[in-house]
């Protein structure tokens, strides 16, 4: 949920020293993520009452609404550059989620799909491609960054 949280935060006012956003395997919304997991993991069809129950539980136990866990608005108003990573074999968050975030993003952006990588394994699967993508991003948007 880290990548999606960062993407959601990008729609808010952030400190001046935040030069860009890096999102590895982020989903668009908690609703879309739940629907994907219900279908792919448990072979359940779309059942609105399940979403409603989960939303109620989120409000009671975690004090937030599932509607709040959505990157759509942030991607429309964010002005900071975003580097999206996603593994082509991610079985937890479908790669289409990063593609949708990329398409909605109005800021400078780049999408890197790492072939064969599973969830959060992009750097492990193709380190050189991952590392070079990061270097190019930092060089372009944060020239003062020190990268070892």
Predicted regions mapped to residue ranges:
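Alpha/beta-hydrolase-fold serine-hydrolase catalytic core, especially in secreted/extracellular enzymes
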Residues: 139-148
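Catalytic histidine neighborhood in serine/cysteine hydrolases
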Residues: 102-120
